[in-house]
Curated annotation (Swiss-Prot):
The lineage of its organism: Eukaryota, Amoebozoa, Evosea, Eumycetozoa, Dictyostelia. This is Heat shock 70 kDa protein, mitochondrial. Keywords: ATP-binding, Chaperone, Mitochondrion, Nucleotide-binding, Transit peptide. It comes from the Eukaryota. The keyword Cell membrane does not apply. It holds the Pfam family HSP70. May function in protein folding and assembly, and disassembly of protein complexes. GO terms for molecular function: ATP binding; ATP hydrolysis activity; ATP-dependent protein folding chaperone; heat shock protein binding; protein folding chaperone; unfolded protein binding. One of its GO terms (cellular component) is mitochondrion. Its main location: mitochondrion. It comes from Dictyostelium discoideum (Social amoeba). PANTHER family: HEAT SHOCK PROTEIN 70KDA. Belongs to the heat shock protein 70 family. Residues 641-658 have a biased composition (Basic and acidic residues).
Length: 658
């Protein structure tokens, strides 16, 4: 155990040094995409010239559902196709996985989540929360990586080439382990994560880009799974965060669950049937809840109709319910109220009153709800600004930051903060802070400590993050031991502990005995997360799966091509039947059948080979037949024209001159 001494040295980086370090990235050659990895939906954008462009996915959407599914034949599907099959495959479909990224299995929030989702949440190898799908363990970082891969593919399709560099956003109130887990997800997805930035900061960047007027803004960000509130000063291209607060387990998913519980309770009261025992019925209700929630943002009432939701003694039972906006607001009133506390704390930490806030920016899909807008207005005593797209602003801001890092976008500087205090456990279990919450990052601080007992030859250093006064009540990030201390009386050894937090908000801790010079350091990674070996293994599996996916895609494309070719050839056979010989027709039909036969096989190369044979065979035959048909048509046309001319010929009248 360590004993606190008076700090001998303070190395907090001043704002200007932080700015220089923030902008001193090495030159990036390729495009840098900005990704909003959301709980419910994700979005990707890129700077093109002086503007940020949101990129559309293969389905034509500007946002992509953060959903990953595994089908009966173990095929992985991501995004909208995965969401569409959730009802029939709920147990093998992962959604809202961001809520568990970097969380321990025994975390109360994990236990709560286990009661709300149809898939299995299990204890991972190091005590963190993982998922089990079809007997396979999947970490939240892996699930996030699958969504990030989808966003990467979307960018590559739109930009016409490979993309490797990205800026990824996280909730401002994410702790160190959650940030590290998000970076791991990016690495697994094959991305070089150039920067992790906070979602409200990114949204403020999207709002303030190309605006010259100095402003103090509050970003009220209520998304699918998290709530953040950040207060920033925007002056001359410098976006400086004054304070941030939030709740990493409050968002649209909770609103959906409140509606779901209401539906289940009402149906049980009316019909006497508990729908929670039917996974498919529950998933249908969940989707209906999400739809009703969205509709009630623009209408005062909606109707939920789900035929054949269950069966009773007398036959099928249907679900029919009318829901008013007023009733919905009653059901989620406590959730909306939970955003007030963080807002007030954020104002206090920033040292500002509501009158000093020039603009309140609404971000996140849930801010479309009128009651949420009313609360934001009453909390800050001003009408919220609704001029940014709540679903796209974060990705746009990340793309702008990508342009800054690449060197293409000038005059923009972000100065962010660490959301929670960082420190170590000292004598008596006290949490001794080294870096306080809302400290500008990057930052470094060194404090000196000593031993708590005589003759200690080693000390264990436990690193925590949080705001409680006792270490045990905060989140343990890491622990390590400094060995080889001289056996001196307690209080004599001087041990320097240095906390370095980088621009991504990630922490490195160094402990050093001043007398011997012996030191030990640890780069914090998620306490129950992925080691370098884990990431390497997952990357290897991902590469192997990528090859399988590529072959499967080639097979599907070959089959589609084969079916299209067969259809066209059979159509041409009918069209040119009068211009092909019997042997030619029979030979072509035989080749068509060969393609049909091979389509049932799992061999794309064989399919393409048979298609080529059919092409080679029909090319000359159909060309000859086509010319013959043209000649025949021309001949008939000429014959008809001559006949018409003959029919139209009249004898000239003349008078013989005498």
């Amino acid at each position: 155990m360590l004993r606190s001494l008076k700090a001998l040295k303070l190395n907090s980086l001043n704002a200007q040094k932080g700015i220089r370090q923030f902008c001193s990235d090495s030159k990036i050659s390729g495009q840098v995409i900005g990704i909003d990895l959301g709980t419910t939906n994700s979005c990707v954008a890129v700077m093109q010239g002086a503007e940020a462009r949101v990129l559309e996915n293969a389905e034509g959407g500007r946002t992509t559902p953060s959903v990953v599914a595994f089908t009966e034949d173990n095929q992985k599907i991501v995004g909208l196709p995965a969401k569409r099959q959730m009802v029939t495959n709920a147990e093998n479909t992962l959604f809202a996985t961001k809520r568990l990224i970097g969380r321990r299995f025994d975390d109360p929030m994990t236990k709560k989540d286990m009661t709300m989702v149809p898939y299995k949440i299990v204890k991972g190898p190091n005590g963190d929360a993982w998922f089990e799908v079809k007997g396979k363990m999947i970490s939240p970082s892996e699930a996030g990586a699958m969504v990030l891969q989808k966003m990467k593919e979307t960018a590559e399709t739109n930009l016409g080439g490979p993309v490797t560099d990205a800026v990824i956003t996280v909730p401002a109130y994410f702790d160190d382990s959650q940030r590290q887990a998000t970076r791991d997800a990016g690495t697994i997805a094959g991305l070089k994560v150039q920067r992790i930035i906070n979602e409200p900061t990114a949204a403020a960047l999207a709002y303030g880009f190309k605006k010259d007027e100095p402003k103090t803004v509050a970003v009220y960000d209520l998304g699918g799974g998290t709530f953040d509130i950040s207060i920033l000063e925007i002056v001359g291209g410098v976006f400086e965060v004054r304070a941030t607060n939030g709740d990493t387990f409050l968002g649209g998913e909770d609103f959906d669950n409140a509606l779901l519980e209401h539906f289940v309770a009402e149906f049980k009261k009316e019909k006497g049937i508990d729908l929670t025992k039917d996974t498919m019925a529950t998933q249908r209700l969940r989707e209906a809840a999400e739809k009703a929630k969205c509709e009630l943002s623009s209408t005062l009432t909606t109707e939920i109709n789900l035929p054949y939701i269950s069966a009773g003694p007398s036959g099928p039972v249907h679900f029919n319910m009318k829901l008013t906006r007023s009733k919905f607001e009653q059901l989620v009133a406590d959730l909306i109220q939970r955003t007030i506390g963080p807002c007030n704390i954020c104002l206090k930490d920033a040292g500002l009153s509501t009158s000093e806030i020039n603009e309140v920016i609404l971000v996140g899909g849930m801010t479309r709800m009128p009651k949420v807008q009313e609360l934001a207005k009453s909390t800050f005593n001003k009408e919220p600004f609704k001029g940014v797209n709540p679903d796209e602003a974060v990705a746009v801001g990340a793309a702008i930051q990508g342009g800054v890092l690449k060197g293409d976008t000038k005059g923009i500087v972000l100065v962010d903060v660490t959301p929670l205090s960082l420190g170590i456990e000292t004598l008596g279990g006290v949490f001794t802070r080294l870096i306080k919450k809302n400290t500008n990052i990057p930052a470094s601080k060194t404090d000196t400590f000593s031993t708590a007992a005589d003759g200690q030859s080693e000390v264990e250093i436990k690193v925590f993050q949080g705001e409680r006064e006792m270490a045990v009540d905060n989140k343990l990030l890491a622990k390590f031991t400094l060995f080889g201390l001289p056996p001196l009386p307690k209080g004599v050894p001087q041990i320097e502990v240095t906390f370095d937090i980088d621009v991504n908000g990630m922490l490195q801790v160094i402990a050093k005995d001043k007398a011997t010079g012996k030191a030990q350091q640890v780069r914090i990674q998620t306490s129950g997360g992925l080691s370098k070996d884990d990431i390497a293994r997952i990357l290897k599996e991902s590469e192997a799966n990528a090859e399988v996916d590529r072959k499967r895609k080639e097979l599907v494309e070959a089959r589609n091509n084969g079916e299209s070719v067969v259809y066209q050839v059979e159509k041409d056979l009918v069209e040119f039947k009068d211009y092909l010989s019997q042997p030619q027709t029979e030979e072509i039909k035989k080749a068509v059948q060969a393609v049909r036969d091979v389509l049932a096989k799992e061999d794309g190369s064989a399919i393409e080979a048979e298609i080529k044979k059919l092409h080679d065979l029909t090319r000359s035959s159909f060309e000859t037949a086509y010319k013959a048909k043209l000649d025949s048509s021309a001949s008939k046309s000429s014959s008809t024209e001559n006949k018409e001319n003959k029919d139209n010929t009249t004898e000239a009248e003349f008078t013989e001159k005498k």
